[in-house]
């Protein structure tokens, strides 16, 4: 039996023994992210209420207006939300700023994971953040890559060593849609792009310096809450 099938069967055996049932993820709060590269809309999941409400609060307070996508890695992700990036000069090191608090992680595998277009919370590395608390303001949007079966099998082994299994749906998505599966179970996914995925593709392909900052600033000109779910604060 192929190794991926064995790993999937083991994963679902654990799921069933825990009494976990499949559930549909609602994505009802909508934020519009306006940038000088184009407009994106993100839906926020009600299944991650701490991150959902925090993102809505920051958007409503105009916290993100004027901030940069300060870290961009081709075929991986685009990251924004560092307070120090507003009007930052080209020689300023970005990415270490925060807004004074962290958020308890809200992992929800196998339902919320790092498919292409997923919205997730950035955080400090495990060495200084073993509990994997999320940044209170920094976020990233996944681009990633499409995985061939052999490459996917390698990722499955790596995740299995950490006690993380992927469902067949997740595997299919990573092979057909693309994403960053190695981040699953370590970073909180709390939303997804529902309009403007081509803008993510455009931004992730820009030229960057040795610190992964775009040579030409990519600015969040405005973030607007278009719709709030009935469960949001």
Regions found by a protein language model. Give the residues of each.
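Cyclophilin-like peptidyl-prolyl cis-trans isomerases
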Residues: 19-233
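Bacterial N-terminal signal peptides that target proteins for export
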Residues: 1-7
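Bacterial N-terminal signal peptides
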Residues: 8-17
């Amino acid at each position: 039996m192929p190794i991926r099938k064995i790993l999937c069967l083991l994963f679902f055996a654990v799921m069933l023994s825990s009494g976990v049932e499949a559930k549909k993820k609602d994505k009802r709060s909508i934020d519009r992210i306006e940038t000088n590269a184009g407009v994106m809309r993100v839906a926020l999941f009600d299944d991650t209420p701490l991150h959902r409400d925090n993102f809505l609060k920051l958007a409503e307070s105009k916290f993100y207006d004027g901030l940069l996508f300060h870290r961009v890695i081709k075929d991986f992700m685009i990251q924004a939300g560092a307070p120090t990036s507003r009007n930052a000069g080209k020689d300023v090191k970005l990415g270490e700023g925060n807004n004074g608090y962290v958020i308890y992680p809200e992992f929800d595998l196998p339902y919320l994971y790092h498919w292409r277009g997923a919205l997730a919370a950035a955080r400090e590395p495990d060495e200084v953040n073993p509990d994997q608390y999320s940044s209170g303001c920094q976020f990233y949007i996944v681009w990633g890559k499409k995985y061939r079966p052999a490459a996917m099998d390698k990722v499955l082994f790596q995740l299995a060593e950490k006690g993380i299994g992927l469902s067949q749906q997740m595997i299919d998505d990573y092979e057909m849609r693309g994403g960053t599966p190695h981040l699953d179970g370590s970073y909180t996914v709390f939303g997804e792009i529902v309009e403007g995925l081509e803008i993510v593709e455009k931004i992730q392909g820009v030229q960057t310096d040795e610190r992964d900052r775009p040579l030409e600033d990519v600015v969040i000109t405005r973030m607007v809450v278009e719709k709030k779910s009935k469960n949001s604060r």
